[in-house]
Curated annotation (Swiss-Prot):
It comes from Watermelon mosaic virus II (isolate Tonga) (Vanilla necrosis potyvirus). This is Genome polyprotein. It comes from the Viruses. It catalyses: RNA(n) + a ribonucleoside 5'-triphosphate = RNA(n+1) + diphosphate. Its EC number is 2.7.7.48. The active site is at residue 5.
Amino acid sequence: RTGSCANGDDIILAVKGEDVWLYDTLSASFAELGLNYNFDERTKKREELWFMSHQAMLVDGIYIPKLEPERIVSILEWDRSKELMHRTEAICAAMIEAWGYTELLQEIRKFYLWLLSKDEFKELAASGKAPYIAETALRKLYTNVNTQPNELQRYLEVLDFNHIDGCCESVSLQSGKETVENLDAGKESKKETSDKGNKPQNSQVGQGSKEPTKTGTVSKDVNVGSKGKEVPRLQKITKKMNLPTVGGKIILGLDHLLEYKPNQVDLFNTRATKTQFESWYSAVKVEYDLNDEQMGVIMNGFMVWCIDNGTSPDVNGVWVMMDGEEQVEYPLKPIVENAKPTLRQIMHHFSDAAEAYIEMRNSESPYMPRYGLLRNLRDRELARYAFDFYEVTSKTPNRAREAIAQMKAAALAGINSRLFGLDGNISTNSENTERHTARDVNQNMHTLLGMGPPQ
């Protein structure tokens, strides 16, 4: 077959050898349509055909599309972005396009190696953000030939997975014990650490705050081969702060304070302590006369019951759990009486589990806890927060916190708690014959014909 390429519109026509004469007539035929085409550029080799700035290159028995080397080099010259990552990605794109041009690909890799040795790219490479495309990956991309294990072994032989840049000290040793001790830069610091570990803890108040300036991040050693100035690191807690002191000594253990990051909910006084919760669980287990496996089922049922009915201290009687279609009743007295400080503070330990349970129910069918139904909560996305022992934490979304606050305000509206009721031994001698209707303002005032009571 013979191919003919028309420059400009990149049209490739192929005909059999005996039909080459067709090319001689095509120019006139296209001219009748007002198109000026030249079909003089002809070839019998696929490698000499160009289409959309690409030519076919035979590699391992497969024709692959290749750009001109000059166009690939222009990709390397692309440097318009402010992001260093974009520059490295452009180089990787040039690697992909250059596969097949062995010499050009080798030069691109040398250029990439030189670029990564520059100061502005060193940090990028050290953090593992500098991309690279191996020869095996390029061959797989173009030929779809899987990589053999022996080819990957070549990479494993030159990689040191235990090496971390900048993690080791370089120590020069000479003969003589005294010289070695002088050159051991880390010995003194190790000795000080050992002495600190053997020192009694109660030697003085606030011993961890003797030198507050050392409690921050230890600055890295300055490399003698580096240029420029080292960027300073700020201390998290410094002696410039107004810290509590007694007798001129800081009473805080700053070393411990920097590492003291407890779970926030463990400090909430709205949640029962772990000891109180364990005591409640053990007491309920004894009074119900159940084992741990049975208590697991009971706790599931009681948590779901509390989601719908709340954890008010005034609950009494029985709570129910479903066994298929059958209701099984359990007395509330052991659960309420042993709940210290309150039942709601005990149930705060179930907050995350209850939230996940509501979310699971909603994934199967619409489910809104009774607590949310009573407050007329209309947004089903907030159903997971619609129970009165939900524990508000720093992770709770702002919209959910607002909904929880409004539901609590609605639940507490109109409540008037009285310490004492009417003494049963006192009786009144007068009979109240006053008659009121539903339209009256209050029990002491008749209707005002539409006027409300004074505010």
